[in-house]
Amino acid sequence: MGYMIKKVTIDDYDAIYELWNSTEQSRRALNPVDDSREGIARYLKRNPDTCFVAVKDGKIIGVILTGHDGRRAIVHHLCVHPDCRRMGIAGHLVSLAEEALQKEGIQKIFGLVFKDNEAANVFWEQQGYSLRTNLNYRNKSLNERIPTGE
């Protein structure tokens, strides 16, 4: 399967949003503010070199959004089109994002995965991401349009 990788630009937004909506797991992780065109534009402005898409025949088939605060990085979204999975695309995107983050001096990265997403949890374990059992993840929405989750 031939595909190319490039850095994400805001011009990719519509295709990325369509990709996210192609899977239930990605769709349920979206929120109307942070994942809006404006939210992603803001994110890319802060993280222009750590977000990548995989493109085949002019169509975006994979995306990873990673960013950092100067200390730690987080994978905010990783998605590969269902028809293009198990071909090494996700691993390739993760590897490129990790390399880009290392170039920016970041030494540690984490990601959030729904507990019931077995395939994703297995994937991240295979990528060397250990499950932290000694922490509780807590969040608070500062905008009534963003759900806090379960």
Can you say where each PLM-predicted feature lies in the sequence?
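Conserved GNAT acetyl-CoA-binding A-motif
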Residues: 101-113
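A conserved beta-turn-beta hairpin within the catalytic core of GNAT-like acetyltransferases
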Residues: 67-76, 85, 132-135
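Conserved acetyl-CoA-binding loop-helix of GNAT-fold acetyltransferases
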Residues: 80, 86-99, 126
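Conserved beta-strand in the GNAT
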Residues: 53, 59-67, 74-79
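Conserved beta-strand-loop-alpha-helix junction that forms the acyl-donor binding cleft
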Residues: 111-120, 139
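Conserved GNAT-fold acetyl-CoA-binding loop/helix
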Residues: 10-42
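A short helix-loop-beta-strand connector motif used in the catalytic cores of GNAT acetyltransferases and
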Residues: 41-53, 74
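Conserved N-terminal entry element of GNAT/NAT acetyltransferase domains
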Residues: 1-11, 144-150
